Amino acid sequence: VLRCWSSGSADFRLDRRAADPHKPPRNPAQEAVIDIQHAQAEFRAAYQGGAPGVFASGLAWLAADAAWYVWGGLYAFFTLFIGGMLIMPLALLIARLFRAPKVSKGNPLTLLGFEAVLPLFAGLLIAWGLMPVSESFAFAAFALVIGARYLSFATMYGERLYWALGAVLFAIGTAFAIRPDLLPVHVTLVVGAAELLFAALLFTRWNASIARSAAA
């Protein structure tokens, strides 16, 4: 029996279990797990484990921090807004420089990727609404939203390090929301530095997994 796997590509396999009555029946739940693991592996390969996106986001936060010091919080917000819009294009550009394969059209995690963009816009709206009240609190609240957003990346990429990244940003946002003068720097600098650190960790883990796969 020929079965077409729904990955978006013409990948046909001979299902020997269906043809052999002595073989145990297929377990749909187990096959679903295999499919989701393949989808996650495809995302990791296409986006280097998500490291370029985290790197681009870190640059956006650092650019906003520079704008905050030079021109003020309002310019920092618009810098972060523009930088946020450029995260995906820059991440894709970096991926193409590494000649990464594209995600297949049938990948079930593609929709999750689009859904993960919505909190970004929600966070920007929340931050914009809080700007007249407190610039520090506005950026801290946005950091909280971004931290929560990263939690979904653990499912998208099959990478638990995103739980740690989300928790760190959530802690940073909470700390600066409670105590804006906690450190002699803006929350934008701390968030940007944290994202660049995790981007390096994510890229290192992805590169190590590629090396293991090549050696196997």
Language model segments and positions:
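Short, amphipathic, aromatic/basic-enriched membrane-interface segments that mark the entry/exit
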Residues: R44-G53, G106-G113, M131-F137, A154-W163
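Hydrophobic alpha-helical transmembrane segments and adjacent interfacial helices
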Residues: G58-Y69, P119-G129, Y150-L151, L169-P180
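Membrane-proximal helix-loop-helix units in multi-pass membrane proteins
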Residues: L120-F170
